[in-house]
């Protein structure tokens, strides 16, 4: 699909999107199409108490309704070892773990070493987790 249309909108099969979901995604895909530091558009953010702007940037991605372009898809790195090397060689552990409040780097190490207990608890398959890491590094 991505090679035919140069972009894709992805939903998990059990999601019921907000009525304006497709309009939001298509507008965002058009708006950020040439922004190479933007790897994807996510439609979910964890609930927060403060009022957020209509659109904003966050580190990472979410697999519960997202969109991307062929340019980002073609750059996707599925090798967890290479992603970990990049994180460690650029001293990004603290940033990537949100000031060490969540063990994403350890989860990546566990994924590399085939110890997926945290990923199972996180309800993420290996692809989802690697895509989230890739997007965060963009």
Where is each model-derived feature located?
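An acidic/histidine-cluster motif and surrounding catalytic segment
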Residues: 1-10, 15-138
